[in-house]
């Protein structure tokens, strides 16, 4: 079998969902049934394989995305083909966090994966972080299958969950399984492709399951959903569609072919159900992974930029192409040092070879290559297109960098990282810890690009910035546990932003004469507002040599640096465009540095007169509460400047959706616990930036002046 043909038996998948929907439990069952683990790890016992960090086991949540490889042979194939090695599917899995503070782990995993299992809580349905993960998967056009988990739990409702997928995610769910029984009577599923009931044994941890006839009391419902399934899937294949409208019977193979085609193209999303904790539905989920999620061969080609020509090109995902890979994660391993995880898109990589990091134009030698299983590792000598492996000892490569062969240099599309929304002041407990803290934060920031730390040049105060209170709490904890350094921590602060509301043109001349060579640069720049989320854009419209070409990068660099300290309260300025339209230079006194300084001063003058405003992060908050506490909870949200969007009944509880400024949400968990006697729960995700009120802006400015 050729190497490229073998790729059709590879699946690179992620498992993602809202916190507590059962992602890690589902992954642990997959590892057990595929033979990777000999016992089932449980989140509540702290015995999971994939959650191996101390902080993960202490809190019962996933913090880092953990990678593992397993192999699966479909039950249908076992009798005839178990002895044929090529029928064994290799599944590379990344289990990702569900907590909003660790969204970056989901984003960078999806960037390098070919497919995803979206796990939903059968009771709660589509939750806020489910929506965030879904949007991230949409961004990278990752095909998905859905697994409605916890069907054994009180209040589980498969059909309501499917409807929520339509309403909240805007997707087209394709039901391919129906649950048999509800809550504590749940015992299996109806397979709408095979048209058989599948029932799991309770005696052997769900390792065995049997096919039965469809129960009589479900016949009508099954026929209805089977009809909907066929009506939807035949649309993707003209030949099969013609057979269907001619009333010819469709084979299971025909139906699977159509489902696969539609799922990979994103026309619909297959939906399955089960209970991972009760060991029901996981094997059929694995069958769906190999049946309906893409192999690396289905990706066809990837977009890249040719280093020599600077032109966009396509490179085929093939072992026969030159080597290229994307680094998507760096971690510090206590035994082997720095580990760089890569996804190989084309060609082969062997230990001992030399490659180039085209992002940084630095050569790297591959001294050791590892196949990872959570925090365990296996040395390998070669990896090929489609593989996800870890490399040790890379000197220059960080998250988002491209590495490739020396003979054919390309740069792959980078990974985008979210901007921090919260910050903490940290200081060493002893003067001797100052350098230790800096060294620890450098290593932690290399692992986690959503962590930013800065040192104030005047006060020498260190500030760490991240995605939420839990995110920064984990960072402080890891500094103590892994780097043996403790810090005093200040109160959390909101990471505000600044923007402008009108256009302004500034003509600024920088002139300095101190004897000998002087400095001269004149720039004329238009500053104008952009739509939310547009970031910063720079354009040069210089013609006729008013400013020599070699000085223009100095203008852009000056603006890039100065925009990080806005004119309102010193926060980064976002969502604006700077257009360089004119200027002048001096043959002797002009330099890149002079134009850099001129641009910075032009920014200060121009932004000040362009209607600068302060922006604060707005969070999308979902509160689930028993009915009797609704009045107090809504009153409290209103007092926090919250805007109630909707209230939705669910049994004896209400779901409140609201937008609330992040600055008003500190300490909310204890307030909610007090208001509801510990019975309500909430989750929040970042939504957007919004102009803060004048009173809050004045308070922030007053603090900034102190």
Swiss-Prot record:
Subcellular localization: Cytoplasm
Keyword list, A-Z: Cytoplasm, Elongation factor, GTP-binding, Nucleotide-binding, Protein biosynthesis
GO molecular function: GTP binding; GTPase activity; translation elongation factor activity
Organism domain of life: Bacteria
One annotated GO biological process: ribosome disassembly
Domain tr-type G span(s) in chain numbering: 8-297
Primary location class: cytoplasm
Positions of GTP binding: 17-24, 95-99, 149-152
GO cellular component, one term: cytoplasm
PROSITE patterns: G_TR_1, G_TR_2
InterPro entries: EF-G-like_DII (IPR053905), EFG_II (IPR041095), EFG_III (IPR009022), EFG_III/V (IPR035647), EFG_IV (IPR047872), EFG_V (IPR035649), EFG_V-like (IPR000640), G_TR_CS (IPR031157)
Cited Pfam families: EF-G_D2, EFG_C, EFG_III, EFG_IV, GTP_EFTU
NCBIfam families: EF-G, PRK12740.1-5, small_GTP
Entry function: Catalyzes the GTP-dependent ribosomal translocation step during translation elongation. During this step, the ribosome changes from the pre-translocational (PRE) to the post-translocational (POST) state as the newly formed A-site-bound peptidyl-tRNA and P-site-bound deacylated tRNA move to the P and E sites, respectively. Catalyzes the coordinated movement of the two tRNA molecules, the mRNA and conformational changes in the ribosome.
Protein family membership: Belongs to the TRAFAC class translation factor GTPase superfamily. Classic translation factor GTPase family. EF-G/EF-2 subfamily.
Name of protein: Elongation factor G
């Amino acid at each position: 079998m050729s190497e490229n043909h073998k790729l059709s038996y590879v699946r690179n998948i992620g498992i993602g969902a809202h916190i507590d929907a059962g992602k890690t439990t589902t992954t642990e069952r997959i590892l057990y049934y595929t033979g990777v683990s000999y016992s089932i790890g449980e989140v509540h016992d702290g015995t999971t394989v994939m959650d191996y960090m101390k902080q993960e086991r202490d809190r019962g949540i996933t913090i880092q995305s953990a990678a593992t490889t397993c192999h699966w042979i479909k039950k249908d194939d076992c009798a005839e083909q178990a002895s044929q090695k090529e029928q064994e599917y290799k599944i590379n899995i990344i289990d990702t966090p569900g907590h909003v503070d660790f969204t970056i782990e989901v984003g960078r995993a999806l960037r390098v994966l070919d497919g995803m299992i979206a796990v939903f809580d059968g009771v709660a349905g589509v939750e806020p972080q489910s929506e965030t993960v879904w949007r991230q998967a949409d961004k990278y056009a990752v095909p998905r299958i859905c697994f409605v988990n916890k069907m054994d739990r009180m209040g589980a409702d498969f059909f309501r969950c499917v409807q929520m997928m339509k309403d909240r995610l805007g997707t087209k769910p394709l039901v391919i399984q129906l649950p048999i029984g509800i809550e504590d009577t749940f015992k299996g599923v109806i397979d709408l492709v095979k048209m058989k009931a599948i029932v799991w044994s309770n005696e052997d941890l769900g390792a065995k399951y049997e096919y039965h006839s469809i129960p009589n009391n479900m016949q009508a419902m099954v026929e209805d959903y089977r009809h909907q399934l066929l009506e939807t899937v035949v649309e993707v294949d003209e030949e099969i569609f013609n057979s269907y409208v001619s009333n010819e019977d469709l084979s299971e193979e025909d139906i699977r072919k159509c489902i696969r085609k539609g799922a990979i193209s994103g026309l619909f999303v297959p939906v399955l159900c089960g209970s991972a904790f009760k060991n029901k539905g996981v094997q059929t989920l694995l069958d769906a992974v190999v049946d309906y999620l893409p192999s690396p061969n289905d990706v066809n080609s990837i977009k890249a930029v040719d280093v020599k020509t600077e032109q966009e090109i396509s490179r085929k995902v093939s072992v026969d192409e030159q080597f290229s890979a994307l680094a998507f994660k760096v971690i510090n391993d206590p035994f082997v040092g720095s580990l760089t995880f890569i996804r190989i898109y084309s060609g082969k990589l062997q230990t001992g070879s030399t490659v180039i990091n085209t992002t940084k134009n630095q050569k790297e030698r591959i001294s050791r290559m590892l196949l990872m299983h959570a925090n365990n590792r296996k040395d390998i000598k070669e990896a090929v297109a489609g593989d996800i492996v870890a490399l040790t000892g890379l000197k220059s490569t960080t998250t988002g960098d491209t590495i490739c062969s020396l003979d054919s240099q390309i740069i792959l599309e980078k990974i985008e990282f979210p901007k921090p929304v919260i910050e903490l002041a940290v200081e060493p407990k002893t003067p001797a810890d100052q350098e230790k803290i800096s060294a620890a934060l450098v290593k932690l920031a290399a692992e986690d690009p959503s962590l930013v730390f800065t040192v104030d040049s005047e006060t020498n105060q260190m500030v760490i910035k991240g995605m939420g209170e839990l995110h920064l709490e984990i960072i402080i904890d890891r500094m103590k546990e892994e780097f043996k350094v403790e810090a005093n921590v200040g109160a959390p602060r909101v990471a505000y932003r600044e923007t402008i509301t009108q256009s302004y043109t500034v003509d600024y001349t920088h002139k300095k004469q101190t004897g000998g060579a002087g400095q001269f640069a004149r720039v004329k720049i238009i500053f104008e507002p952009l739509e939310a989320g547009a970031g910063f854009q720079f354009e040069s419209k210089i013609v006729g040599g008013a400013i020599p070409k070699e000085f223009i990068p100095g203008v852009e660099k000056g603006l890039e640096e100065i925009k990080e300290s806005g004119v309102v309260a010193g926060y980064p300025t976002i969502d604006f465009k700077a257009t360089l339209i004119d200027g002048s230079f001096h043959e002797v006194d002009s330099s890149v540095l002079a134009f850099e300084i001129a641009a910075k001063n032009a920014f200060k003058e121009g932004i000040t007169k362009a209607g600068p405003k302060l922006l604060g992060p707005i969070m999308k908050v979902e509160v689930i509460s028993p009915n009797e506490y609704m009045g107090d909870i809504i009153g409290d949200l209103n007092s926090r400047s919250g805007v109630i969007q909707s209230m939705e009944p669910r049994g004896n509880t209400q779901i409140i959706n609201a937008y609330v400024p992040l600055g008003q949400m500190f300490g909310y968990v204890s307030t909610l616990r007090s208001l509801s006697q510990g019975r309500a729960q909430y989750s929040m995700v970042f939504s957007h930036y919004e102009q803060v009120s004048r009173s809050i802006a004045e308070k922030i400015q007053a603090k900034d002046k102190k």
